[in-house]
């Protein structure tokens, strides 16, 4: 049985004061022991968050990593080996904001995926379609292509030590969300695509939903058979809301 996961992506938010307040709120939460829980702060707060969450079950990840695992001459970048040394456990790769706004292509994302795994960290591979692609009926084609890029490069076995997050781009930060049935349809298609390569891997890979998940809709979303938790954006910046989402995943 797949263990649920809830991961909070803090994105480019936080000051020293607000991060300290958020840590304090998270420490007070009654969190389920049956759920893997992670937060991904902006990198300059990584050490502060890891230290503040010591003694809790919450692990800390990163929102991005460089195209190479080791340190080197890449100004402004952070190597996955440095993230591992700092205490991170997982790293986002391919988030829609980096695909859409930064222009990261599959070739770059594959290098990051490999570097993250080479450093002993877990990549959280984000895939999803835009509103235009959904309206054109291209959802499954788009997410399938994004997933195929990794499988073609590394083989299905690379996903044994990875998490996949389906995030419909049109539902991120907009307040819109796919219905539980719509989200389940895509998650089921993703798992079916994986099963064509290896049924055992397909059944073991955790598929998170990442489109405006809130405490109010988490229970229904997480009740779907192929939704194994959530990649949480704005709601993860509120400790009480995030705690409620985590508890929903544990039900």
Curated annotation (Swiss-Prot):
Catalytic activity: D-glyceraldehyde 3-phosphate = dihydroxyacetone phosphate
Location of this chain's protein in the cell: Cytoplasm
This protein's record includes keyword Isomerase: yes
EC number: 5.3.1.1
Gene3D superfamilies: Aldolase class I
Any GO CC annotation of this UniProt entry: cytosol
Catalytic residues as annotated in Swiss-Prot or TrEMBL: 95 (electrophile), 167 (proton acceptor)
GO molecular function: triose-phosphate isomerase activity
Family, as annotated: Belongs to the triosephosphate isomerase family.
Role description: Involved in the gluconeogenesis. Catalyzes stereospecifically the conversion of dihydroxyacetone phosphate (DHAP) to D-glyceraldehyde-3-phosphate (G3P).
Quaternary context: Homodimer.
Protein name, per record: Triosephosphate isomerase
Organism in which the protein naturally occurs: Pseudomonas syringae pv. tomato (strain ATCC BAA-871 / DC3000)
Record gene name: tpiA
């Amino acid at each position: 049985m797949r263990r649920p996961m809830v991961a909070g992506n803090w994105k480019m938010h936080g000051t020293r004061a607000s991060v300290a307040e958020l840590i304090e709120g998270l420490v007070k939460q009654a969190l389920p022991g049956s759920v893997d829980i992670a937060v991904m702060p902006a990198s300059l707060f990584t050490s502060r968050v890891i230290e503040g969450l010591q003694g809790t079950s919450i692990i800390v990840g990163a929102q991005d990593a460089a195209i190479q695992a080791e340190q080197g001459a890449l100004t402004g970048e952070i190597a996955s080996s440095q993230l591992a040394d700092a205490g991170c456990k997982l790293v986002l790769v391919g988030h829609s904001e980096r695909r859409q706004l930064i222009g990261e292509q599959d070739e770059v994302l594959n290098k990051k995926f490999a570097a993250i795994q080479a450093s002993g960290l877990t990549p959280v591979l984000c895939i999803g379609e835009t509103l235009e692609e959904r309206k054109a009926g291209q959802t499954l084609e788009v997410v399938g292509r994004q997933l195929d890029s990794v499988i073609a490069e590394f083989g299905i076995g690379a996903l044994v030590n990875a998490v996949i997050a389906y995030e419909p781009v049109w539902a991120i930060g907009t307040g819109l969300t796919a219905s539980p049935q719509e989200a389940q349809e895509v998650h089921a298609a993703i798992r079916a695509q994986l099963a064509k390569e290896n049924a055992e891997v397909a059944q073991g890979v955790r598929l998170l939903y990442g489109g405006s998940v809130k405490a109010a809709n988490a229970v229904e979303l997480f009740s779907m058979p192929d939704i194994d938790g959530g990649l949480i954006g704005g709601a993860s910046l509120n400790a009480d809301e995030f705690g409620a989402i985590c508890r929903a995943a544990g039900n």
